[in-house]
Amino acid sequence: MAFYDVYAHPALIRYRTCVCTRATLFVCVVLGLTYISPLLVAYRSQGFWLKRNSYEEQPVVKFQYDLILLGVTDTTGNYLAWSTFPNFNRLIGDNLRIPEISAQEEDKNQDGKSDVLLLQISVPLKPAEQMFSVQLLLTFSYQLFRMSTVVMQTLAFIQHSSPVPGSQLFICGDLRLNQRTPLPHRGLHSTYNVSVIDGSSPFASTYDLTNIIRLYQQRNLTTHLSGVIPVWTVGRAANAPFQISAQIHYPVEMIDYRPGFWETIKFAWIQYVSVLLIFLWVFQHIQTFIFQNQVLPTITIPPFKQHRS
């Protein structure tokens, strides 16, 4: 008749000793090394406490339809300008040119958020005028919601010049987010939810592009045009307006943030346990060798009771 194993379990052998013995001291040392050493190893290997993390998010970006346009019309420094701010237009005087503007935001991937801005500006020029340089400042509403809620006003600055007069400028780029410090992991961040340009101010310094950019760059959170590809077209027909075409994409951003308490603990716990398992395996085999071979004297308790005959 053939036999086979239907069930198996390990036999538990106990080793007993008094409190004040070398075996007790050995067990205490092993326990300390088993559970404290992994903590030291994980901490000294750097990155134990998670201080900074990141995630991807598609921002909610809306063009605010506020802009400042400056153009140089000859080599002597004559210029034309226009903006959506009445006070600025009054300061320009005879250099004011009112353009035709068409703006459209599209949701390419149908996720409910705009992905690209298509902007078309047609600037009228006098017959004797030519366009050598263009500066264009656009404002946007920028929002994030996945971790902390960020609501702010941002801008994009476009600039291009050429020694040869042109008839059209085409610009293509991505509106990218800049962070100087990580965001908090939760809460409302609306410090920069104010207009980048104070349209109610009657002073010319308020609309100076140098001042606007200088103050804007002092912020922790800003946006800029990245990967800009300008195309300058020459050969303008008489009495034809100068055309500005911009295609600005709103890409998915990698947002840096400071992790919360529980995320930090979770990350540290994973590192600690991964090292702890190695120490548990090593010291378990060391203890088994020590007590099985009675290197330290103990009383062995067999796994089965001895029955009297």
UniProtKB/Swiss-Prot annotation:
Glycosylation sites: N193, N220
Keyword Glycoprotein: yes
GO biological process terms, semicolon-separated: cilium assembly; regulation of protein localization; smoothened signaling pathway
InterPro entries: TMEM231 (IPR019306)
Transmembrane parts of this sequence: 23-43, 267-287
Pfam families: TM231 (PF10149)
Disulfide bond sites: none
UniProt-annotated location(s): Cell projection, Cilium membrane
Swiss-Prot/TrEMBL keywords: Cell membrane, Cell projection, Cilium, Cilium biogenesis/degradation, Glycoprotein, Membrane, Transmembrane, Transmembrane helix
Assigned GO CC terms: ciliary membrane; ciliary transition zone; MKS complex
Family: Belongs to the TMEM231 family.
Xref: PANTHER family: CHST5 PROTEIN, TRANSMEMBRANE PROTEIN 231
Protein name according to UniProt: Transmembrane protein 231
Gene: tmem231
